[in-house]
Design a protein with these regions (language model features):
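Often metal-dependent polyanion-binding catalytic scaffolds in large enzymes
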Residues: 38
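Short, Lys/Arg-enriched N-terminal segments with co-localized hydrophobic residues
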Residues: 14-35
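Alpha/beta enzyme core
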Residues: 41, 45, 52-53, 57-257
């Protein structure tokens, strides 16, 4: 069989996916939180000269010394995405001088809402070497699935909190408040996700530019479109921009990477 990197997307259609059995080599999930009394985040630890368990694991995987990796983490050139609540994670580093990492997007939608199927996708992705799982669920009760991911999946887990905001509160977009959006970010952090996509860049000034300057295309980002629509409906500033410091405090508390 050819190496996956030598194949085109269509070549995978005939592949049969082998799901991991009970003898999987993935590390077992441990109960409880990782100890972080001396530092808040992996970056903070690196800046303090503290060698974390995650740093040691990543250095070994990347065939680097701790002394080579630590300054890269301290300077923000490498991120070790490892939420302190995701205790079964098999840590990976992302960034400068490291191996390329594979991310797999999945999640339920209105048209496909079977969480068991999504978990099968997760197992298949991990068994084939995926380093990260991005949960893009946009329908139904997402909490049990997200918590199952962080309880059982050793890969990094990412989410897009804005996708979850409307379905979490089950209210019209225009009725949500800035606090509602920020609270969902906290919920995802508490649930153990390792990284999040936040649409902080669009501002009231940006909206005026969009209205007065013709674009070749409409906004193509789903999350960006939701933020844009909410701002137009309410006349308010982007909550992720206006309350950015509060968002950073939340992410720092749980060690979540943006």
């Amino acid at each position: 069989m050819l190496s996956p990197v030598a194949l085109a997307a269509g070549d995978f259609l005939t592949w049969r996916i082998r799901l991991p059995d009970s003898g999987s080599s993935s590390p077992p999930c441990e109960k409880g939180e990782k100890r972080m009394e001396q530092y808040t985040t992996q970056m903070d630890a690196a800046r303090r000269g503290i060698v974390t368990k995650e740093l040691e694991i990543v250095a070994k995987k990347e065939r680097m010394t701790v002394e080579e990796l630590m300054p890269l983490v301290a300077e923000g050139k490498v991120a070790i995405c490892a939420n302190k609540h995701h205790t079964c994670i098999d840590p990976e580093g992302v960034g400068s001088m490291l191996r390329t990492k594979i991310n797999v997007n999945l999640g339920v939608s209105r048209d496909c809402k079977d969480y068991d199927v999504e978990m099968e996708k997760v197992m298949a992705a991990v068994s084939m070497g995926a380093h990260a799982i991005m949960d893009l669920s946009s329908h139904g009760n997402t909490i049990p699935f997200r918590r199952k991911l962080t309880a059982e999946c050793p890969a990094m887990i990412g989410t897009v909190p804005i996708y979850d905001s409307v379905i979490h509160y089950q209210r019209d977009l225009a009725t949500l408040t800035a606090k509602d959006f920020i609270d969902v970010v906290r919920l995802h952090a508490e649930d153990g996700v390792d990284f999040v996509t936040l649409h902080c860049g669009i501002t009231r000034k940006t909206i005026e530019q969009i209205r007065t300057h013709k674009r070749k295309m409409n906004i193509v980002s789903r999350g960006g479109s939701l933020v844009f629509a909410w701002m137009c409906m309410t006349g308010n500033e982007n909550p992720f921009y206006e309350h950015y410091d509060e968002v950073l405090d939340i992410l720092r508390e749980y060690d979540v990477t943006i």
